[in-house]
Swiss-Prot record:
GO terms for molecular function: structural constituent of ribosome. This is Large ribosomal subunit protein bL32c. SUPFAM superfamilies: Zn-binding ribosomal proteins (SSF57829). Pfam families: Ribosomal_L32p. It comes from Thalassiosira pseudonana. Keywords: Chloroplast, Plastid, Ribonucleoprotein, Ribosomal protein.
Length: 54
């Protein structure tokens, strides 16, 4: 079984965590922005159907 030989430093751990959080925040901001533009009807980069055909 693979086991890490040495302990990861706090700086490296914090750097990785900050990067992960930055990516998550960017993704959340993007989705919120898209939702707002869809609600306002000003979307240009997203294709969707207004009415569902049954």
């Amino acid at each position: 079984m693979a086991v890490p030989k040495k302990r990861t430093s706090k700086a490296k751990k914090n750097s990785r965590k900050a990067n992960w959080k930055r990516k998550a925040a960017k993704s959340a901001q993007k989705s919120l922005s898209l939702a707002k533009s869809i609600l306002r009807g000003k979307t240009t980069s997203f294709v969707y159907r207004l009415y569902v055909d049954e």
